[in-house]
């Protein structure tokens, strides 16, 4: 049915659904088809606990390997994030994508490919949740400015090559989200 609605063959649809299943975002239901997985509060909590364990490690290693060119790239990504977040009409998808680009640009510098893949999987599991609830988080001006300040604090720690500081900041901010 989906293939005919989209005007494509069944093969790309099957591949896309298999990919979603592999990432834990969808599940096959015998005699019914495929459906999206519903995350419980506990699922979200566990994902944030795992992110809190992994992301500060990747950021710490990134801080030890970061170049001036990397910092310049992050400044540009952050500037675009600020522009997007401060728009009158906020687009949750744009915010999510730019936020993801910022974080993964940091983690990629670590060269810890397996850890980065695990982090990416955790983000993928939360992507729909973050798009829905992330919009609510960014409704107020104060909340938006806090997110900008968080990103700026990471950038400042990276510029100073302060690996302990960036690790601490990320862990602290992720822990807050776990508690909420």
Language model features: what each stretch is:
Residues 72-88, 94:
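Amphipathic alpha-helical segments enriched in hydrophobic/aromatic residues interleaved with Lys/Arg
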Residues 1-64, 114:
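Short linear motifs at protein or domain termini
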Residues 61-62, 81-89, 133, 158:
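Secondary-structure edge/capping motif, primarily at the C-terminal ends of alpha-helices
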Residues 78, 119, 170-171:
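Inward-facing hydrophobic residues that define packing positions of alpha-helical scaffold repeats
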Residues 50-66, 100-140:
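Hydrophobic, amphipathic alpha-helical faces that serve as interaction scaffolds
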Residues 131-180:
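C-terminal all-alpha effector/ligand-binding and dimerization domain
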